[in-house]
Design a protein with these regions (language model features):
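C-terminal non-catalytic interaction/assembly regions of soluble proteins
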Residues: 273-437
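Glycine-rich oxoanion-binding loops at beta->alpha junctions
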Residues: 46-103, 131, 143-171, 176-192
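Short, ordered loop/turn segments at secondary-structure junctions
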Residues: 9-12, 37-43, 77-78, 108-111, ...
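Short glycine/serine/threonine-rich phosphate/pyrophosphate-binding segments
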Residues: 13-23, 44-45, 81-89, 106-116, ...
Length: 437
């Protein structure tokens, strides 16, 4: 293979340029030309296929900066319709005209789903990225746990019930994804900063973090030492939450709560999806979980509690919300993300050169080897209907009574943040939380 294309698709993450850099470095070593396709899958719909030569004469172009967030190539949320064979044939012809023999797609579970029809026509592989850390499997047979419902009504949806209450962390397929560690650093720093406002004004802060339906970002926000963490994998127990908030507020005169944007109530309804809208990829927009939770606390706790303490005139005055927002997705990636993103970009090049197709580079972890790159056939991620689902945080990672990471969850996080840049994360904070549990 002499010429490869690479594109970045889906939401931006801090480590995308590092992935591109890793692919360029490996392509240079193998004397393979690397063409960057501009604006993700969208480039494939353009007759010109906008592109840039990333390694002329097998040297990096200076614009590639692995320490810079975002993506030099641009991204989109467009995907290829697997049933549109005319468009797929046209895309294949366009890439052939550029003499591109294989394609690397940098993305998450949506991109892995989207590359399937391309892989049926020419070699295509995935280099992983997502701040949500929801690309992968908790254990190899996890796709078999999905069930499809609603066929009779026409409202088809998928549900899953974990078959294992415990599992070995070494079984995880794609232990962690580049972009996640940086997003955790930003979230934890936001929690720490908002704490001082809550302390100063005797208030209750609800901080919303990203992650969609997976609780990994909220879980690791424990590095910022919130009092309570709420994750989507465990439906909200409002009465328990109110009791816990009252207990903490009585003790220390302030409370900091981290709430995942995909949080659900006891009936399974998403708190942040009260207004139905979708993003360009068709995903339901989750925005407002923290506000919905604040309204519930205001109603349940009432004004008299705060007036009795003489700390606020009303519950509405005492309880406030903040979103960490898109700062989790942007900015300079920390060293852990830069290093392993580059390794995975290089692995994707190797996969194509070695003749693989419809495969994903992954970052694995074991007690004996630590972190190391590997790969899996993309079909390993698919359920019986051929669909790839976002990975949920395993319920065993969270203690629903204490409303914080469980010992298993802490064991999961430690390898990541022990190896992350010590200038960006404070590993000792997790030990403090463990001692308090």
């Amino acid at each position: 293979m002499k010429r490869i294309g690479i594109l970045t698709d889906g939401g931006d993450t801090p480590a995308l340029n590092a992935t591109i850099q890793g692919a360029v470095t490996r392509a240079n070593q193998l004397k393979v030309e690397l063409f960057g396709l501009i604006k993700g899958f969208n480039s494939l719909f353009n007759p010109r296929v906008p592109h840039a030569h990333l390694n002329p004469l097998f040297h990096d172009i200076p614009e590639i900066d692995p320490t810079r967030g975002g993506t030099l190539l641009g991204a989109s949320r467009d995907y290829v319709d697997p049933d549109d064979h005319t468009t797929l044939d046209t895309i294949s012809a366009r890439l052939a005209k550029l003499k591109i023999e294989g394609l690397i797609c940098v993305g998450g579970d949506g991109t892995l789903n989207g590359l399937q029809p391309l892989a049926e026509r020419f070699p295509t592989v995935l280099a992983p990225k997502t701040i949500d850390n929801d690309l992968g499997l908790n254990y190899p047979n996890e796709p078999d746990e999905w069930r499809r419902e609603g066929q009779k009504t026409g409202e088809v949806h998928y549900k899953r019930a974990p078959s294992r209450t415990v599992f070995d962390l070494e079984q995880m397929v794609n232990y962690v994804t580049p972009g996640y560690a940086t997003a955790v650093f930003v979230s934890a720093a936001g929690v720490e900063r908002i704490r001082t406002t809550a302390e100063s004004h005797r208030r209750i802060a609800i901080i919303e973090v990203m992650g969609r339906h997976s609780g990994y970002l909220a879980l690791a926000s424990a590095y910022g030492r919130p009092d309570i963490t709420l994750v989507p994998e465990h439906p909200l127990d409002l009465e328990l939450l109110v009791d816990r908030v009252k207990e903490i507020y009585d003790l220390q005169k302030n409370v900091v709560i981290v709430c995942a944007e995909g949080m659900v109530d006891a009936q399974g309804n998403e708190l942040g999806a009260e207004s139905v809208s979708t993003d360009p990829a068709g995903n339901k927009v989750l925005s407002g979980a923290s506000e919905a939770l604040a309204r519930k606390l205001i109603q349940m706790m009432g004004d008299k509690l705060f007036q009795g303490y003489r700390r606020a005139n009303s519950a509405r005055e005492a309880i406030f919300t903040r979103k960490v927002g898109h700062t989790q997705r942007g900015g300079r990636p920390i060293l852990f993300d830069r290093f392993y993103a580059a390794q995975l970009g290089g692995k994707a090049v190797d996969l194509l050169v070695e003749g693989h197709n419809n495969a994903a580079a992954t970052l694995q972890w074991s007690r004996s080897k630590g972190f190391h790159v590997s790969s899996f056939d993309a079909n390993r991620f698919r359920d019986r209907w051929g669909h790839i689902h976002a990975r949920f945080m395993h319920p065993s990672f969270y203690d629903p009574h204490l409303m914080k990471p469980s010992r298993v969850g802490i064991e999961y996080l430690l390898p990541i943040f022990t190896h992350a840049s010590q200038t960006c994360t404070r590993v000792g904070l997790m030990a403090v939380n463990l001692a308090m549990s």
